[in-house]
Amino acid sequence: MLPMITGFMNYGQQTLRAARYIGQGFMITLSHTNRLPVTIQYPYEKLITSERFRGRIHFEFDKCIACEVCVRVCPIDLPVVDWKLETNIRKKRLLNYSIDFGICIFCGNCVEYCPTNCLSMTEEYEFSTYDRHELNYNQIALGRLPMSVIDDYTIRTILNSPQTKKG
């Protein structure tokens, strides 16, 4: 008879303990009802990024001196810098600059150590594509067009038109 009574007492204690734990969980749930939502409705609302957010890298072709510091400080040697040595002026001329954001770890070393500040981090974080090769950005996709305004075909056409030569 005594083991039966202790069994009922243990069962009762376990029941009370379970009810207390359920009540604690319910109280935590109720305490969250007055709080603001943590999630955002992504396509319709944009995430407000902090000042130091490391998003897509912006590149300014005109400022780059092809020193390749960005390649040396990158942990994965990611930026591809193609340049040509101009022998008459003994300077490097930048031909092509590209970064593959499918491989980039967004550490920011290239931006931090660039001597001419031609690289900067933007707030852009949407990189969704169906093909991973679309994540390889060249200098045109990274920033401004790498051609001077006078070399542009549209500008040359306008400058060579007879109407502009009259005025």
UniProtKB/Swiss-Prot annotation:
Catalytic activity from the UniProt record: a plastoquinone + NADH + (n+1) H(+)(in) = a plastoquinol + NAD(+) + n H(+)(out); a plastoquinone + NADPH + (n+1) H(+)(in) = a plastoquinol + NADP(+) + n H(+)(out)
Binding-site positions, [4Fe-4S] cluster 2: C74, C104, C107, C110
EC number(s) stated in the UniProt entry for this protein: 7.1.1.-
Coiled coil: none
Short name of any one Pfam family annotated for the protein: Fer4_9
Co-factor requirement: [4Fe-4S] cluster
Cofactor note: Binds 2 [4Fe-4S] clusters per subunit.
Reported function: NDH shuttles electrons from NAD(P)H:plastoquinone, via FMN and iron-sulfur (Fe-S) centers, to quinones in the photosynthetic chain and possibly in a chloroplast respiratory chain. The immediate electron acceptor for the enzyme in this species is believed to be plastoquinone. Couples the redox reaction to proton translocation, and thus conserves the redox energy in a proton gradient.
Name the record gives this protein: NAD(P)H-quinone oxidoreductase subunit I, chloroplastic
